Each structure stands twice: as C-alpha cells, then as structure tokens.
C-alpha cells in the first residue's frame, strides 16, 4: 500500500544529510519546540538524529501519539524533553506566536487523518499547518470554523490530489502556499488538480521539488520568501 510504503521505507538519513546541517547553518544548537504532525516515517523518521545533535526542549504531538514505539523510546532516551499532547481547541502562546489546534478532535492513532492542523499567528500573518490531512478532515475543520482565516498555507500531504480541497480553499484564499515534496517522487506530488485549485485562489506557490530549501522571514513591515535552488525572492507588505 502507498501508506505502508511511506511508513516503512528505508532511505539515507535525511536528518543527518539535510535537516541537521541546515539548522546548524542557522547557528541553532537547540529547538524550543518541535511539532510532529503524525507518525508516518517521512514526518518523524529523522527525530532521533535531530535529537542527537540538537537539544529539543519540547515535543508537540497529537494526544494518543505518545503511545507509539518511537515516542516511548524518546521518553526513555531524553527524559528532559517536555511534552505537549494536543487536541482540537488547545491554544497557547510562545514568544511572539499564538498557536491554535484545529485537529485532531479525538485521540491520535498517528495516522494521516490524525494529523495536527494548527493555526500559527506570527505578527500580522497566520499560517495553517496541515500534515497529511485529507479533504475529509479539511471539510470537518472548515465546517467547525466558518470564520477561519489564514494568509499562508502549508499544503496538505505533499500536494496530494486528496488534500487542499475545495471546502478549505473556497473558505480561505491564502496569499502564499508552500508544498513540501521530493523531486521526481513516485507519487506524482504535487498533483495537477491541487496545483490548479491553489492557482485559482491567487496564491503564490512555492514547492521544494523545484525551489529547494524555502526560507520565510517575517517582520512587522513585510514578509519575505527566498528559495535556494531557483533564487526566487518575493516580498509582500504586511
């Protein structure tokens, strides 16, 4: 199954070759918060490598996900890490950010449909993080939050055809959309249908398979997006 292929795939340690060097290049020795959307290998598989090389202060996961083997191992190996187990309705502030969890509603089984959907308000912008949630989850969230607003979307499930659906994009038209997907991936992400839906909203689209590393900088005056491979640069006033 496609799901199982993602969960059990064995490839080179992207944590060591990509994530850790990128974070260390920014001068980071510790991470105040790390949010894990759900339990798929391509979302949590590099956690142990990251924790080995950088200090993690707090892990944010869906309530119930703490029962999976990886989380149990992390608790034993890194007892000083704080844990925040979240469900829809949870809110908290951290520095200049405000976090609001929109999903999951019930205990997480660490599956795609249990992905954390979170709104992160930073200065004058609001970002929607979506994990691998499907249109079905998006519809439930849109129905429960008819006044939902966000300016930046992290597109769901790597730009899959079954995410970033009409229910969500009819309710909100983001200014920016980010798609995280591998170059020449076996699943054809992002799908043409999803790209068409995002383009119809007027969103400026950035995608890691083409743009490489994407950097988002926010100040009170503007937001700036730059890309490593394509050298794109986009500035928008706040």
Identify the residue ranges that each predicted region occupies.
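Non-globular, low-confidence helical/coil segments that flank catalytic cores
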Residues: 1-238
